[in-house]
């Protein structure tokens, strides 16, 4: 169930779901696995907020175990495409594609709450069918692995070989370790946005 928020102004009352109310304050919340529905919603929100005010920053709070690489890359590309700076904030867990999107925020504006966890690893996948079909899928997963590792290398300042080694298996970090790694820029104790 999605909580509702009652807002009173000028003698009238309006009811919003909490996510719509947060969006009015330029806050996007990714609190689930990355799927095509999730990606379509977040891409639409990013484009809407850019159209509303291309000069005003956007805040994206992330609590996600990851999900679809293709859908996550759609969000990532849109984050790079829109004009506003994007603050990313890890709340709870940013794993796999969640961590990738956390690192995709504007440099200097990527953060985490202090008890969150961040995890990077290589893309997961599987294939069935004829040998030639399996080969096609394997080649695609290797391509995606290289693409994600290259982006992480650029965003963290780490050598590509270091990223490849670290993402070979699940690699968990505390927020402070993620700062040292270059995935984020600061650990938050205070709220980075105005009261809503």
From Swiss-Prot:
What NCBIfam families does its record include?
A: clpP, PRK00277.1, PRK12551.1, PRK12553.1
**Could you name the domain of life of the organism this protein comes from?**
Bacteria
Catalytic reaction(s) noted = Hydrolysis of proteins to small peptides in the presence of ATP and magnesium. alpha-casein is the usual test substrate. In the absence of ATP, only oligopeptides shorter than five residues are hydrolyzed (such as succinyl-Leu-Tyr-|-NHMec, and Leu-Tyr-Leu-|-Tyr-Trp, in which cleavage of the -Tyr-|-Leu- and -Tyr-|-Trp bonds also occurs)
Listed A to Z, the keywords are: Cytoplasm, Hydrolase, Protease, Serine protease
- Listed GO CC annotations: cytoplasm; endopeptidase Clp complex
Q: Which organism is it from?
A: Prochlorococcus marinus subsp. pastoris (strain CCMP1986 / NIES-2087 / MED4)
What gene does this protein come from?
clpP1
Give the family this protein belongs to, as stated in its UniProt record: Belongs to the peptidase S14 family.
Q: Where primarily located?
A: cytoplasm
Task: Name the lineage.
Answer: Bacteria, Bacillati, Cyanobacteriota, Cyanophyceae, Synechococcales
Catalytic-site annotation from UniProt:
96 (nucleophile), 121
Gene3D superfamilies linked:
2-enoyl-CoA Hydratase, Chain A, domain 1
Q: What does this protein do?
A: Cleaves peptides in various proteins in a process that requires ATP hydrolysis. Has a chymotrypsin-like activity. Plays a major role in the degradation of misfolded proteins.
What is the designated name of this protein? ATP-dependent Clp protease proteolytic subunit 1
Swiss-Prot/TrEMBL GO biological process terms: protein quality control for misfolded or incompletely synthesized proteins
């Amino acid at each position: 169930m999605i909580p509702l928020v009652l807002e009173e102004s000028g003698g009238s009352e309006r009811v919003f779901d909490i996510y719509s109310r947060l969006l009015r304050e330029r806050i996007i919340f990714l609190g689930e696995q990355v799927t095509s529905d999730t990606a379509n919603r977040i891409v639409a929100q990013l484009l809407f907020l850019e159209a509303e005010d291309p000069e005003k920053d956007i805040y994206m709070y992330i609590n996600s175990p990851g999900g679809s690489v293709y859908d996550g890359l759609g969000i990532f590309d849109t984050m790079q495409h829109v004009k506003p700076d994007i603050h990313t904030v890890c709340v709870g867990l940013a794993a796999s594609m969640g961590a990738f999107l956390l690192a995709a925020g504007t440099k200097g504006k990527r953060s985490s709450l202090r008890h969150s966890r961040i995890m990077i690893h290589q893309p997961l996948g599987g294939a069935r069918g004829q040998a030639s079909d399996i080969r096609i899928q394997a080649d695609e997963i290797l391509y995606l692995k290289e693409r994600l590792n290259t982006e992480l290398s650029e965003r963290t300042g780490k050598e590509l070989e270091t990223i490849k080694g670290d993402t070979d298996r699940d690699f968990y970090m505390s927020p402070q370790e993620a700062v040292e790694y270059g995935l984020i820029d600061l650990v938050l104790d205070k709220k980075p946005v105005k009261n809503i």
